UniProtKB/Swiss-Prot annotation:
UniProt organism field: Hydrophis hardwickii (Hardwick's spine-bellied seasnake)
Official protein name in the record: Cysteine-rich venom protein 2
Disulfide bonds: 75-153, 92-165, 148-162, 184-191, 187-196, 200-233, 209-227, 218-231
Gene3D superfamilies: CAP, Crisp domain
UniProt keyword terms in alphabetical order: Calcium channel impairing toxin, Disulfide bond, Ion channel impairing toxin, Neurotoxin, Secreted, Signal, Toxin, Voltage-gated calcium channel impairing toxin
Cellular compartments annotated: Secreted
Tissues expressing the protein: Expressed by the venom gland.
Domain annotation SCP: ranges: 38-164
Signal peptide from the UniProt entry: 1-19
GO terms under cellular component: extracellular region
Role noted for this protein: Blocks contraction of smooth muscle elicited by high potassium-induced depolarization, but does not block caffeine-stimulated contraction. May target voltage-gated calcium channels (Cav) on smooth muscle.
Species lineage: Eukaryota, Metazoa, Chordata, Craniata, Vertebrata
Length: 238
């Protein structure tokens, strides 16, 4: 039987005759498969070209996984409402994959990553208009909390969802999802196998917080509340 797979926002339907597995055996509730999903993401993040000087190591997050499960259980090939994709202070991004047969999680993640063929670092989508958002979310440097889940919607419809916190794919930075340079160049004292392990626990509300803090310092409650990462996360990846 030929399986079809679809990635959200991808207009074409892709066909594949191998890679299918028993759905129950691939449950993301199992610790082994959580480890497989995290390890697959980290291996891909570690292997980016050009190399990344600020790429954070991903870790499994149960709250993100619960949110992903609720999203998958809707059995709707559409992103879940943004307000339902939060973990603590972080807003979370989301990748969705649909297939007519069950797939191994490593194959799902690889399918998202394979959009790299239409991505050029520093330029973005090439040719222009190509879908690259699943790839860029996987390699977004500061997305370090990961949770995934799947749902069997029918005998011919399987939905896979991963959520990433904090969210990536900031439009103004989509061509540079990480800072190029020597691996762990921005975290020499907090590095494990080429990935940084010093994430900031805060998230700035504005992309120009560096400029705001330079101008006004972190002396007002407004600045501290709107730019907490810039104000408080020294020597961390923000």
């Amino acid at each position: 039987m030929i399986a079809f797979i679809v990635l959200l926002s991808l207009a074409a339907v892709l066909q594949q005759s191998s890679g299918t597995v028993d759905f129950a055996s691939e449950s993301s509730n199992k610790k082994d498969y959580q480890r497989e999903i995290v390890d697959k993401h980290n291996a891909l993040r570690r292997s980016v070209k050009p190399t990344a000087r600020n790429m954070l190591q991903m870790k499994w997050n149960s709250h993100a996984a619960q949110n992903a499960k609720r999203s998958a259980d809707r059995c709707t090939f559409a992103h879940s409402p943004e307000h339902t994709r939060t973990v603590g202070k972080f807003r979370c991004g989301e990748n969705i994959f649909m297939s007519s047969q069950p797939f191994a999680w490593s194959g799902v993640v690889q399918a998202w990553y394979d959009e790299i063929k239409n991505f050029v670092y520093g330029i973005g989508a090439k040719p222009p208009g190509s879908v690259i958002g699943h790839y860029t979310q996987i390699v977004w440097y500061k997305s370090h909390l990961l949770g995934c889940a799947s749902a069997k919607c029918s005998s011919t419809k399987y939905l896979y969802v991963c959520q990433y916190c904090p969210a990536g794919n900031i439009r103004s930075s989509i061509a540079t999802p990480y800072k190029s340079g020597p691996s762990c160049g921005d975290c020499p004292s907090a590095c494990v196998n080429g990935l940084c392990t010093n994430p900031c626990e805060y998230e700035d509300a504005y992309t120009n917080c560096n400029d705001l803090v330079k101008e006004r310092k972190c002396q007002t409650e407004w600045i501290k509340s709107q730019c907490p990462a810039t104000c408080f996360c020294h020597n961390k990846i923000i």
